[in-house]
From Swiss-Prot:
Organism: Colwellia psychrerythraea (strain 34H / ATCC BAA-681)
Enzyme class, UniProt record, top EC level: lyase
GO MF terms held by the record: D-serine ammonia-lyase activity; hydro-lyase activity; pyridoxal phosphate binding
Annotated Pfam families: PALP
EC number: 4.3.1.18
Protein name: Probable D-serine dehydratase
Length: 443
């Protein structure tokens, strides 16, 4: 993209100038529609989510055997929702603003197996592929007890096949660990941002880790090429996969059940705001789709991105989607939020979800570190930097009168609001790494 194009983009979308200056910005989507209007553009519906949910239920007996830590939830990979009222008080004090309603944290950071939101989509896509291969080979039927997959016989069957994926870290962890457990040969192509401990953990599980000095897009492309050269190799495409997307979407119905158990009502007078950190977009996009299907127009999904990697905001704001990367406008895509270090958003997710997302904001690395330190101090919960991107959301929303007015959000409704921060990772960060993170937090 040449300077003339950039000048034209800035003329058309003045917000881009601030983004290029790495300022924290927010943008609330003027093109949002109702679920009914926006759903046809997704190309998926509740039947697809139900199918994903049923598949995960079929695999539950296997998961209990393969990963005993999932026995407590009967082989279903799910995380807790906790209220963080001390954090809410601290945020109100620091930002001198009153957050109406309650503040909750969704602890995907502490999901079993890989300790991140990617345990949803990544594991689901590996299981889907394994099921398809086994059914095609007539060694498995849908009515079988899937715990039979936890045998040497099946490990040997899956070992003829391989799986490849490109990742900044967390997706590679979930896909690598799951694939290796089933018996697949698996290669994870890791971008320059990937943390060393994640690579070491994967290698300990027998995963082939391929390292690059370039960013996420290069790692994905190399993974794609590996699969193209081998008919028995399956490439998990984080940029375009509907299967990954559906693995995440199951979270919506499950959250609804958790809210029911907690007596939390979501309706027109009791709105739900959900703040989701966004990298390439598959995880937050899939979760947001599931939330919309579960709560309809009463849930407001807002994506949070690092100031250095605002790829989904850039793609949806300009309507160019994956036709533009942050590097095209001079942003470096280098951030401490390694899980969000993506320069070019998923075109599939952007086009599918652009009418169903309320807004976007960007957050600096230092602010993520500061919030990480604060959450640890007042709630005793430790997350990785990218998982804190959503924590600023309630402040951004509360301070945006124009947006609240546009969605007819009266003060009476806001008092009853639930603000949910989706914590995307950090539960498996080694203590020495966590110390480094905490040392970067401001007092």
């Amino acid at each position: 993209m040449n300077n003339d194009n950039i000048a034209q983009l800035i003329a058309d979308f003045p917000l881009i100038e601030k983004m290029v200056e790495l300022k924290e910005v927010s943008w609330f989507n003027p093109n949002i529609t109702s679920l009914q209007e926006g759903l046809p553009y997704v190309g998926l519906d509740n039947n697809n989510i139900q199918d994903a949910s049923d598949r995960l239920a079929r695999f539950a007996p296997y998961m209990v055997k393969a990963f005993p830590e999932t026995a407590i939830t009967n082989g279903i990979i799910e995380s807790d929702v906790v209220e963080i009222s001390a954090m809410k008080s601290q945020l109100e004090q620091q930002y001198e603003v009153e957050i109406q309603g309650k503040l909750l944290l969704k602890k995907d950071s502490h999901l079993p197996i890989s300790g991140s939101i990617k345990a949803r989509g990544g594991i689901y896509e590996v299981l889907t592929h394994a099921e398809q291969l086994a059914i095609k080979a007539e060694v498995l039927e849908l009515s079988d007890d899937y715990s039979k997959l936890f045998t040497e016989e099946f490990k040997s069957f899956f070992s003829q096949y391989s799986i490849a994926v490109g990742s900044t870290g967390n997706l590679g962890m979930s896909i690598g660990i799951m694939s290796a457990k089933l018996g697949f040969s698996v290669s994870v192509h890791m971008s320059a941002d990937a943390r060393q401990w994640k690579k070491e953990k994967l290698r300990a599980h027998g995963v082939n880790v391929v390292e690059y000095n370039e960013d996420y897009s290069v790692a994905v492309e190399q993974g794609r090429q590996e699969a193209e050269n081998d008919p028995k190799c399956f490439f998990i495409d984080d940029e375009n996969s509907q299967t990954l997307f559906l693995g995440y979407s199951v979270a919506g119905e499950r959250l609804k059940q958790q809210f029911d158990a907690m007596h939390i009502v979501v309706d027109e007078n009791n709105p739900l705001f959900v703040y989701l950190p966004c990298g390439v977009g598959g995880g937050p996009g899939g979760v947001a789709f599931g939330l919309k299907m579960a709560f309809g127009d009463n849930v407001h999904c807002i994506f949070a991105e690092p100031t250095h990697s605002p790829c989904m905001l850039l793609g949806i704001l300009t309507g160019l989607h994956d036709g533009i990367a942050v590097q095209d406008i001079g942003i470096d895509n280098i951030t401490a939020a390694d899980g969000l270090a993506v320069g070019r958003a998923s075109g599939f997710v952007g086009r599918a979800m652009e009418r169903l997302l309320d807004g976007f904001y960007t957050i600096s690395d230092q602010r993520m570190y500061d919030l990480l330190g604060l959450l640890n101090k007042v709630e005793g919960i430790q997350l990785e930097p990218s998982a804190l991107a959503g924590m600023l959301g309630p402040i951004v929303v509360t301070n945006n009168d124009e947006y609240l007015k546009r969605i007819n959000m009266s003060n009476e409704k806001l008092v009853n609001a639930t603000h949910l921060i989706w914590a995307t990772g950090g539960g498996m960060v080694p203590a020495i790494e966590m110390e480094k993170y905490l040392s970067k937090a401001g007092s």
